[in-house]
């Protein structure tokens, strides 16, 4: 309603376009943050249930969303208090590079993540999570 009063139908179209882009971006990031990881239903969310990265540019531009594992550990912390976690699964690149691959080259992203998923299974997954994967 506000968009229409401010800019007419053009404002409404812009509002809808921005909303669609924002939703696509949010879901792409969510997909990337949890890609291929499993958790036993009802078990607590832990550090190893999301991908982490400590790339400086991504951290600055995306308000530390790169410290996603710490957010899983302590969801109520403000973004500026999120710290890198050494014992969390690590993305091969920063969020911005990885997101570009997810959106435009999904087959390349999957191939790039295969060794990371094997490492996760061998070093982070619980026995129950390994059984879910098998």
Protein language model regions, located:
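Cytosolic/stromal cytosol-facing helical appendages immediately following the last transmembrane segment
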Residues: 15, 21-134
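Transmembrane helix interruption/hinge and helix-loop junction motifs
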Residues: 5-13
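Hydrophobic, membrane-inserted alpha-helices
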Residues: 1-3
